[in-house]
Amino acid sequence: MQERSIKRIILVCSVLCLLAAAAFANNNTKEENIDRGIRFTETNPPVAPVRPIAEFEPASAVLIRYPLGIPLSLVVQLANTANVICIVSSSQQNSAISAFTNAGVNMDKVSFINTITDSYWTRDYGPWFIFDGNGEYGVVDFVYNRPRPNDNLVPQIFANQLNLNYYGMNLQQTGGNYMCDGVNTAAQTNLVYSENGNNQTNVNTKMNQYLGITNYCVVADPNNTYIDHIDCWAKFLAPDKILIRSVPISHPQYNAIETTATYFANQNCAWGYPYRVYRVNTPNNEPYTNSLILNKKVFVPIVGSSNDNPALQVYRTAMPGYEVIGISQASSTPWESTDALHCRTHEIPDKNMLHIVHTPWHSIISAGTDIVFNVEITAHSGQPLYTD
């Protein structure tokens, strides 16, 4: 009797789930139903040599999702820094417009992409960006490492709506576990290997083909948390600068974090000399490395701790010329040690940027010595360059 009752309950639940799914599908717009028909397919890689675009490069926009995972006050600041592209379902767009308008967001800087999403973690499922060997801007997609099918479609929908070159890289990945230097280097935890069958050769090859990564720093996660995302403990601030969290010697992850910091201090950056490693104190697992660099501003999550101001000062010391802004959490979506501001936003690089490449002088020279700098300038806007 008990077994039969259980079977009946399961049957009723199954029917209710099917009805709910049908009702949800019927609320989709025609455009959103078309979006659901897109499926991931690996494409040919971009024309080599490929250059990955770093977070600290010029950005035209920032990608967020509504309902929000960030405070409305941050949306106001983002719209004063770049364009804001908001992913929202058609049924919720008016709600988003009302919330943004009431908060004082500059709506001239806001545009919408209508599609259904499963979560607000645009960092994790959003597109990655490259310039190919012909200087053409493009989106690199991947298989999102979470069972969120709507989120997994966002890079394709984004590329389609903005008419961008699209490349599908058949690796299971997540944006919170990826950072690059804008030259040839990427850093990730070894989650990338374990989620791709521990086939390191395959992962390394695809990262090179699709993103131009020739210097690949893959390390164990020193935080030893469930998520294994690198943005929970480190951040590239420039091609030769990396920020890594620090903790007291009594902290259970002290040894692992110090070992990782030493590893990066002994690695050469793309410019041929060791990384300058900056440390930010996180004794209570504060998410200070989980920040967003957007043009010349750095938005840092703060938690009302006495460690907030010293953390902001670390950024100011490491990044002269940037405005460093502390952002308090929304009570409904608080910052967490494994999920904060960086996880819920995603910069969109400027496809028309002026890209200037030169290797900084790093050694001591005598006074009066002439120095020759070789500089390569690319106007991705297609506009001519003028000599001075």
Language model region names:
Residues 1-4, 24-30:
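Enriched but not universal
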Residues 2-13:
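Bacterial N-terminal signal peptides that target proteins for export
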Residues 7, 16, 60, 293, ...:
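Serine/proline-rich low-complexity intrinsically disordered segments, especially terminal tails, linkers
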Residues 12-21:
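Bacterial N-terminal signal peptides
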Residues 26-355:
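The feature marks the mature, well-folded catalytic cores of soluble enzymes
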Residues 349-388:
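Glycan-association/targeting regions that enable binding to alpha-glucans and other polysaccharides
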